[in-house]
Amino acid sequence: MVFCGGALLILVPAMVTAMIYTALLQQGGEQLLFDALRIRGEMSSALLARRLYGVWMDVARSAELIDLTDLKNAREHIDFLSRLDRRYTWLGVADLEGTILAAKDGMLEGVSVAQRPWFRRGLVSPAAIDVHAAQLLATQLPAPREPYRFIDLAAPLRHAGSVAGVIGAHLDWKWVAESMDSLQVPGIDVLLLSGDRTVLFGPPDLINKPLNIGSALAASRVTTASLRERWPDGRDYFTVIVPTVGFANLPSFGWSLLVRQSADEALASTRNLIRSFWSSFGACAIATLALLFCAAQWLRAPLRRLSNTAEALLHDPSAHPPYSETRFNEAARLSDALARIQSKLMGLSVSNSIQGSGGDN
């Protein structure tokens, strides 16, 4: 009973405390992971946006410098900027009717772009057009191994305070993909999503596919969130949403970033720590029980001898005298008390015997 009671008193609170501790450890580990992924996502978004912003500033400055009434100067400016920055696959200007007046290497000059999104939106305000397949340029450029894909930047051209045309720039999507690739680290995926939740950059099995999971839905609603969820590959991931990719006055492409890490990989160190804790806890529990058992046996031996002696005295006061217990003070006092009780019982027995003998005489 002493052993069982002591074991319950020690192990039950210890188990409850250990379970609370491991739960807090797990929760703290997950929060640290989310924080790390959020920082990674924000840094990736900022780096990508700043790279795009550098190109945008060139386009915006060109919109201020180019005067469509001086096409020679416009061509010189376009040629200079195109040679200076090879990221431009195409750079050109169009009048209000959408006719290209001047362009890099003369590509598309005289062609109408009136129906192209970059032109229509560029007439109204600075614009950024999401990735799309090459259309008019497809026949002007060397045949590639893979179809050309571009993102567009556009801005209004003004003359005497009024819109006189549009400047447009086509950037090869490969440059954006290379920029995204440079943001990747082992074990962590940084995905780029379009406004309609299509994966523009990410794991090969997801590229150009719509992503219909909670984090993608949250990203499309411009909501910052961190969650653990199951992805189409059937695995659980810790996911952080960075809802916008923007910097300063860079026009929005409608992009968002998702940063994910496999839950199994992310929690491996935390689980190892928890496993080590429970192993240590188990070893300590076994050692504690062993010590408790030894202590119980240490207490039990004198108490058993004393109880046996007390039972013997009930039947025969002249039985073997109590063992002189010295293991602990209480046992010693009980032993002395039993010895005195035995002496009194034996004295009473002798007195009764004498009185019985006197009565017979």
Annotated model-derived regions:
Residues 213-275:
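Extracellular/periplasmic juxtamembrane segments that couple receptor/chemosensory ectodomains to their
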Residues 298-313, 320-349:
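HAMP signal relay modules and closely related sensory coiled-coil linkers
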Residues 72-87, 116-117, 162, 166-220:
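Solvent-exposed, extracytoplasmic
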Residues 1-27, 279-286:
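Extreme N-terminal signal-anchor transmembrane helix of membrane signaling/transducer proteins, especially
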Residues 146-184, 201, 240, 254-264:
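Conserved beta-strands of PAS-like sensory domains
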Residues 35-36, 40, 50-129:
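Extracytoplasmic/periplasmic sensory segments of membrane signal-transduction proteins
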Residues 100-171:
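Extracytoplasmic/periplasmic ligand-binding sensor regions of membrane-associated signaling proteins
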Residues 57, 82-100, 127, 180-200, ...:
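Short N-terminal helix-loop-first-beta-strand/juxtamembrane motif that initiates sensory/input modules
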